[in-house]
Amino acid sequence: MIDDTLLEAEEKMEKAVSVAREDFANIRTGRITPAVFSKILVDYYGAPTPVQQLASFHIPEPRMVIITPYDKSSLGAIEKAVRDSDLGVNPSNDGTIIRCVFPELSEQRRRDLVKVARTKAEEARVSIRNVRRHAKDTIDRIVRDGDAGEDEGRRGEKDLDEATHRYVGQVDELLRLKESDLLSV
């Protein structure tokens, strides 16, 4: 039972790291990636549809993205969704593709984005610690109910602490990489 609890806790911790990785991918750096468009939904025939399902992305320059819709009739809707998003970019439409030129990040904007990244990292750490607390309570209950011995309980808590440190370390490493990416010009 303790092993099941540890396995479940590790899955939840992995999910927290995965969410942090996605959050970091959505924070814009000096180099643009298609991931910055991942949260944009396009009103496509009345249904909100992720822009990645409607178009392909090409990055010819570090600050330019060319969006090529699979269906030319969705060009206007994609352009409107990008313009209305919080990306701070004004897309231009030439009839077949949409060009998005992103402005250079100012030093102050970079610092603000580092703060956002640190906040996202702290949210992930808190989530991991909450999973640890819940799993520790479950292990304590299993030992208290007599379903496992105290030695097993201590071993389980030790394994849980090691997993917690490992996953918090992964979040810290993701944050370190994102900060260096943001602060390099």
Swiss-Prot record:
Tell me which Pfam families the record gives: RRF (PF01765)
- A GO CC term assigned to this protein in UniProt: cytoplasm
Specify the domain of life of the species encoding this protein: Bacteria
Keyword Membrane annotated: no
InterPro entries registered for this protein in UniProt: Ribosome_recyc_fac, Ribosome_recyc_fac_dom, RRF_sf
Major location category of this protein? cytoplasm
**Which compartment or compartments is the protein found in?**
Cytoplasm
User: What are the record keywords, sorted?
Assistant: Cytoplasm, Protein biosynthesis
Q: Which GO terms describe its molecular function?
A: ribosomal large subunit binding
Q: Biological process GO annotation list?
A: translational termination
Q: Relate the protein's function as given in its record.
A: Responsible for the release of ribosomes from messenger RNA at the termination of protein biosynthesis. May increase the efficiency of translation by recycling ribosomes from one round of translation to another.
- Of which family is this protein a member? Belongs to the RRF family.
* Name of the protein this chain belongs to: Ribosome-recycling factor
Gene from which this protein is expressed: frr
